Amino acid sequence: MLAEGEPAIVQIGWAATCVMFSFSLSLVVWGRSGL
């Protein structure tokens, strides 16, 4: 999926997606822990 010479905006987009996914999982875990 990652090609050479890929635009920076695409890499930033993937990074943002990964961050938001991890953040969502953290909220779910913390929510179930009662914090």
From Swiss-Prot:
InterPro entries: Cytochr_b6-f_cplx_su8_sf (IPR036143), Cytochrome_b6-f_cplx_su8 (IPR005497). Pfam families: PetN. It comes from the Eukaryota. One of its GO terms (molecular function) is electron transporter, transferring electrons within cytochrome b6/f complex of photosystem II activity. The chain crosses the membrane at residues 10-32. GO terms for cellular component: chloroplast thylakoid membrane; cytochrome b6f complex. It is found in: Plastid, Chloroplast thylakoid membrane. Keywords: Chloroplast, Electron transport, Membrane, Photosynthesis, Plastid, Thylakoid, Transmembrane, Transmembrane helix, Transport. It is a single-pass membrane protein. Signal peptide: none annotated. Coiled coil: none annotated. The keyword Amino-acid biosynthesis does not apply. One of its GO terms (biological process) is cytochrome complex assembly. The keyword Cell inner membrane does not apply. Belongs to the PetN family. Component of the cytochrome b6-f complex, which mediates electron transfer between photosystem II (PSII) and photosystem I (PSI), cyclic electron flow around PSI, and state transitions. Unlike its orthologs this protein is not encoded in the chloroplast. The 4 large subunits of the cytochrome b6-f complex are cytochrome b6, subunit IV (17 kDa polypeptide, PetD), cytochrome f and the Rieske protein, while the 4 small subunits are PetG, PetL, PetM and PetN. The complex functions as a dimer. This is Cytochrome b6-f complex subunit 8, chloroplastic. It comes from Chlamydomonas reinhardtii.
